[in-house]
Amino acid sequence: MANELFEKGLQIRREVLGAEYVDASVSQADDFSRPLQELVTEYCWGNVWARPGLDRKTRSLINLAMLTALNRPLEVKLHLRGALNNGCSKNDIMEVLLQTAIYCGVPAAMDSLRVAKEFFQEVESKQD
């Protein structure tokens, strides 16, 4: 798995999603799942996320909107952590959910809101 694009992607992925999560995903890859891990790390993180056109905060907000539209709650939860790591506030995230409610549908936004509420409760309980 070692090449320059992979290493760059791995670094960005760790910075955004957290090293513990990423390292576990990569280390648990087997012959079946490794090709997808490589693809995601190299092209999603090493190529697209590394581009200079948008900052990471903006990319995180866009991801949350798209994942809400696609109704992908597991990915929403993962990218909520990334959004915080990239400087997004709880208010920024709520604004994305309000925007998606109008353009993607209230049910999709409500599902993401439930995920976000649970996520923020976990984060806040760890801070106490």
Question: Model regions: which residues?
Answer:
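Acidic, glycine/proline-rich low-complexity segments that act as flexible tails and inter-domain linkers
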Residues: 1-57, 85, 111-128
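Substrate/cofactor-recognition hotspot
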Residues: 106-110
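A short hydrophobic/aromatic micro-motif that marks alpha-helical segments and, especially, helix-coil
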Residues: 33, 70, 104-105, 120
